[in-house]
Amino acid sequence: MSAKEIVQEFYKSDALLENETVSRLLHDDVVLEWHSSKGFLKLNRQEIMNITTELAKAYIRSKIRITHILEEENTVSVRYSHYVKTIENPREEMLLAHFMVIWELKNDKLYKGYQMSQL
């Protein structure tokens, strides 16, 4: 798979709720630097996996709507909106946030991420 295809696999519908999928696509030494509306986070592999677990507990569906995706060698940039459906209200789709992320891949896995998000 190309770097772009690997990133698309990571953001396909419901993938962020699936520990197995996320784990398979993350490099062992992955680091995600995330600037959110709540502040700065620097996440390692286990912390990213913990977020996946928490998302799976809170939401029954996760949908990523990618508006832009660009690939240059082992680097992929993605602009997307993340929508979810809650267990309490499965018919209503809610916007979680808008995201822009640049992923560097190593050995066909997500290695370094630089992400910004805003609700």
Task: Annotate each language-model stretch with its function.
Residues 73-84:
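A short hydrophobic beta-strand element
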Residues 96-119:
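Short beta-strand edge/turn micro-motifs at domain boundaries
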Residues 26, 82-84, 101, 117:
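Short beta-strand segments enriched in hydrophobic/aromatic residues
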Residues 20-69:
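A solvent-exposed, acidic/Ser-Thr-rich amphipathic alpha-helical stretch
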Residues 84-95:
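Short, cysteine-centered beta-strand-loop-beta hairpins and adjacent loop/turn segments enriched
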Residues 33, 79, 113-114:
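Beta-strand residues in well-ordered beta-sheet regions across diverse protein folds
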Residues 24-26, 73-75, 103-110:
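Short, solvent-exposed coil/turn segments at beta-strand boundaries
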Residues 1-25:
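Short acidic-aromatic low-complexity motifs
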